[in-house]
């Protein structure tokens, strides 16, 4: 987690979501090493309490403007997503010296942990805060997602995003000023991972199924355990809850699009996809606006299955 934060007010509802030969003379030693490796038990999964302790230390670093936490505890491939898209680690560190923030207090609650394989942990929690950054008041309550990955024997943050908690029916027609500041982070192209095309295809299929209110198709495209934070900061903890929301009659959409996508592998069987999502239609009587979506996929056999997502209105 890092607190380069983009404070946004919800707009309109949108779905979201080679081998080398070994010299013969080395075979015995290598076989012995392989046997030792095979016999070594897998490292235990992290506890929610341990990762939340690390997460809270990141919030304290944000409060104290201590960029060293990011340097030490954020993966080099990590990033945040806000209303303008991705912000990389270097920009996060820079913001701690260029952005003026006064954080009087904060608290984290309702924390949950979901594993996306043995080396990827997804934390979700509510965040209450009394803060002003560059003259802009932070929203009092947001629902946050923070993802950690195992790097060697250490767990490091790799992703953070938040959605302001608002009443969908009371949300304005367009977003208010962004939390995070007048600082304009340069939009840098993200080199696509080799798996980007496959993930984009999976994401597009999911959006089409949402458009068509196709419960069966959504069930096929998603993993057994899923959770989701929508554009209004509402958290859906189970697959049943998410499916009920996605297939409800609240949205009337004719066309959907998934563009500006980039993928990053988090582990051999887990990947994160960020993209700009759009829909031609309305949700809850309001025109659907563009969103920045983040989706986590896990590999099941030959297929990528959606397991977690968070959406933010695009600025």
Spans of model-derived segments:
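Short beta-strand edge/turn micro-motifs at domain boundaries
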Residues: 141-175, 290-315
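A short gly/proline-enriched turn/hairpin at secondary-structure junctions
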Residues: 73-87, 95-101, 221, 225-236, ...
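Bacterial N-terminal signal peptides that target proteins for export
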Residues: 1-8
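Short, low-complexity N-terminal intrinsically disordered segments enriched in polar/charged residues
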Residues: 21-76, 158, 166-216, 220-224
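A mature extracytoplasmic/lumenal domain signature
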Residues: 74, 84-85, 112, 119, ...
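Bacterial N-terminal signal peptides
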Residues: 9-18
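Surface-exposed, charged secondary-structure patches
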Residues: 93-141, 243-290
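Hydrophobic pocket/interface hotspot
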Residues: 58, 66, 70-71, 78, ...
């Amino acid at each position: 987690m890092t607190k380069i934060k983009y404070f946004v007010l919800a707009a309109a509802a949108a779905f979201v979501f080679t081998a080398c030969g070994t010299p013969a003379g080395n075979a015995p030693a290598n076989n012995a090493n392989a046997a030792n490796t095979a016999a070594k038990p897998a490292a235990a999964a992290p506890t929610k309490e341990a990762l939340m302790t690390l997460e809270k230390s990141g919030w304290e670093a944000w409060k104290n403007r201590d960029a060293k936490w990011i340097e030490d505890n954020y993966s080099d491939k990590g990033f945040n997503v806000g209303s303008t898209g991705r912000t990389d680690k270097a920009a996060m560190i820079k913001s701690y010296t260029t952005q003026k923030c006064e954080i009087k207090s904060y608290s984290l609650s309702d924390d949950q942990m979901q594993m996306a394989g043995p080396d990827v942990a997804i934390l979700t929690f509510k965040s209450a805060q009394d803060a002003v950054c560059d003259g802009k008041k932070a929203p009092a309550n947001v629902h946050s997602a923070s993802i950690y990955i195992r790097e060697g024997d250490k767990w490091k943050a790799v992703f953070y995003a938040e959605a302001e908690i608002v009443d969908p029916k009371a949300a304005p027609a367009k977003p208010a000023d962004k939390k995070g500041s007048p600082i304009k982070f340069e939009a840098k192209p993200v080199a696509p991972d080799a798996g980007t095309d496959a993930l984009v295809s999976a994401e597009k299929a999911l959006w089409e199924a949402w458009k068509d209110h196709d419960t069966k198709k959504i069930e096929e495209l998603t993993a057994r355990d899923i959770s989701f934070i929508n554009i209004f900061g509402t958290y859906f903890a189970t697959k049943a809850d998410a499916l009920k929301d996605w297939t409800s009659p609240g949205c009337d959409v004719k066309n959907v699009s998934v563009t500006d996508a980039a993928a990053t592998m988090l582990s051999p069987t887990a990947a994160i996809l960020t993209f700009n999502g759009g829909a031609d239609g309305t949700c809850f009587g309001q025109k659907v606006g563009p969103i920045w979506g983040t989706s986590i996929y896990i590999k099941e056999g030959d297929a990528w299955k959606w397991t977690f997502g968070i959406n933010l209105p695009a600025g």
